[in-house]
Every structure is written in structure tokens, then in C-alpha cells.
């Protein structure tokens, strides 16, 4: 079942949308470091071409990075999670630890990981309000996900959130 572009927009905003002129976001961030990066793997969205996108929270905008449907590739990088191929989209939550570790040392890694939980919970709540289903998948091969998405060396994938109709 296809998602609407409005639904996708709302899901991404719920995870990392800017809520204040100072750049604060929908999910709390230790020291306002905002280490998270969101990617969208679009497979079945009305009004949006299949492909890989980066979410620019500061502009509430998608930047297309590629036009290949990567849902099957991500499912292949997540053993036992083949069902992900059938989702309309997959939201990928990655972290750039540097902003958090610069301020908090190694503890910044923990703070970034906690922030993933906040962002994911917001997606869960927004999905439920839109009568959509999702799950936070952490069982994946980090290296393979980085390769599939061509993530920059400083970014670490921390969660995959397939979303579809219930």
C-alpha cells in the first residue's frame, strides 16, 4: 500500500523536525548537539520517486541521493528481516558522533544512541496516529548498510524503521 507524501513528511518531521528558531527539534538532544541524520528509502510513495533521500531537518526538505529502490538491499543487510522489502518506505536513523563526543567525550556516543530512541518513539507515535505500522530494526550488518546507502565515513547507521499500512 502506497503512502502519501504528506504522511512521509509528517513521519520525518516527527523524528527530527525543527520546532524552534534556535534549531531545537522534536526529539531532545543532549547539549543540542543534534547528531542524528535521517535517510529515506522510498519505494511506494504517491508523489515521490523511488530512491534514496536525505532529510534536511533545518529546511524540512528531502535531497535525492539516488533513484534506486534500496528496500530489498537493506532487507538483505538485516538477517531475518526479509519482511522489510514489503514496506512502503524505510527510515534510516544514522548518527554523526563527533558533535556529541566533542562536547561530552565518549559519553556523547551514549547520548546519541539515546536520541535514536527518542526519534524512533516519535515515529512510532506518528505512525500510529496515521494508522500506519512500523518497527525499529537494529538487527543489521552495519558495514553492509553503510555500503548500500553510501554513508559518509563519519556516519553510523543505528536504526532502520520500515513503515507501511496496517
Q: Model segments located where?
A:
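N-terminal amphipathic, basic helical "cap/leader" segment at the start of enzyme domains
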Residues: 1-87
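Small-aliphatic-rich amphipathic alpha-helix that forms the alpha element of a beta-alpha
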Residues: 11, 38, 89-93, 97-99, ...
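Solvent-exposed coil/turn segments that connect beta secondary-structure elements
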Residues: 16, 43-45, 57-58, 94-98, ...
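Short, surface-exposed helix-loop/turn micro-motifs enriched in polar/charged residues
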Residues: 30, 134-137, 153
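Short, charged, solvent-exposed linker or helix-capping segments at domain edges/interfaces
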Residues: 50, 102-103
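Conserved hydrophobic/aromatic beta-strand scaffold that supports enzyme active sites
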Residues: 54, 90-92, 160
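Short, mixed-charge aromatic SLiMs
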Residues: 60-61, 144-154
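A glycine-rich helix N-cap at a beta->alpha junction
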Residues: 150-166
Amino acid at each position: 500500500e502506497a503512502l502519501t507524501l504528506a504522511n512521509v513528511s509528517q513521519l520525518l518531521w516527527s523524528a527530527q523536525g525543527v520546532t524552534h528558531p534556535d534549531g531545537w527539534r522534536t526529539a531532545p538532544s543532549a547539549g543540542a548537539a543534534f547528531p542524528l541524520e535521517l535517510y529515506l528509502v522510498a519505494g511506494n510513495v504517491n508523489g515521490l520517486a523511488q530512491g534514496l533521500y536525505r532529510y534536511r531537518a533545518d529546511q524540512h526538505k528531502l535531497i535525492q541521493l539516488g533513484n534506486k529502490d534500496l528496500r530489498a538491499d537493506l532487507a538483505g543487510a538485516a538477517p531475518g528481516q526479509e519482511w522489510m522489502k514489503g514496506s512502503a518506505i524505510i527510515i534510516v536513523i544514522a548518527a554523526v558522533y563527533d558533535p556529541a563526543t566533542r562536547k561530552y567525550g565518549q559519553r556523547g556516543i551514549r547520548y546519541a544512541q539515546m536520541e535514536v530512541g527518542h526519534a524512533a518513539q516519535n515515529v512510532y507515535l506518528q505512525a500510529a496516529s496515521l494508522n500506519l505500522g512500523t518497527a525499529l530494526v537494529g538487527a543489521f550488518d552495519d558495514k553492509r548498510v553503510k555500503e548500500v546507502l553510501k554513508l559518509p565515513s563519519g556516519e553510523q547507521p543505528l536504526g532502520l524503521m520500515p513503515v507501511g499500512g496496517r
